[in-house]
């Protein structure tokens, strides 16, 4: 019999919140990897996460070629409100309080201007802005909420995007954590 570990007692309830698990990125591909929406690929290439859109993609980037807030990989939301990064997190308890924390930044790809992410969990929503100079960098943000079900849907959606040299760019999301508050 194997021992079960309760994620609410040991740390992060989000699966692959650091985005370290995902498709292989070849070292000679400085543009990252475009990940298709779940409608095109029932089994998401980003374990734990669904890419929700009719036709748009997200960009999976690496620290070798981009600014990544933590670790070696992150996700850049390049299609604005037309795509969302979603995870159904099991194990939440209705009526209990939780904190969702994450990093938002830019990929050091020349994307200049105001970048924004709308984040949703349970009945709460928060828009987080990041003023990008296009040279890399990030800031940490959080959303506190009270669970309304045994499973909580966590959603990240870019509130805007930009174009640099005919290439879409947007906010980078990384280091996603969900913990129960005492």
Q: Where does each model-flagged region fall?
A:
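Aromatic (Trp/Tyr/Phe) and Gly/Pro-enriched flexible surface segments
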Residues: 1-121, 125, 129-182
């Amino acid at each position: 019999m194997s021992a079960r570990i309760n994620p609410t007692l040991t740390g992060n309830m989000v699966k692959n919140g650091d985005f370290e698990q995902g498709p292989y990125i070849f070292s000679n591909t400085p543009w990252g990897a475009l990940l298709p929406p779940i409608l095109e690929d029932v089994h998401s290439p980003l374990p734990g996460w669904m890419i929700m859109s009719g036709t748009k993609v997200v960009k999976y980037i690496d620290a070798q070629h981009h600014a990544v807030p933590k670790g070696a990989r992150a996700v850049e939301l390049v299609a604005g409100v037309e795509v969302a990064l979603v995870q159904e997190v099991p194990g939440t308890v209705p009526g209990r309080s939780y904190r969702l924390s994450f990093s938002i930044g830019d990929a050091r790809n020349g994307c200049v201007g105001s970048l924004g992410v709308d984040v949703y969990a349970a009945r709460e929503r928060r828009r987080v802005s990041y003023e990008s100079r296009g040279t890399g960098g990030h800031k940490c943000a959080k959303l506190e909420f009270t669970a309304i079900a045994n499973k909580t849907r966590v959603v990240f959606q870019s509130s805007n995007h930009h174009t640099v040299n005919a290439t879409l760019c947007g906010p980078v999301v990384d280091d996603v954590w969900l913990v129960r508050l005492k």
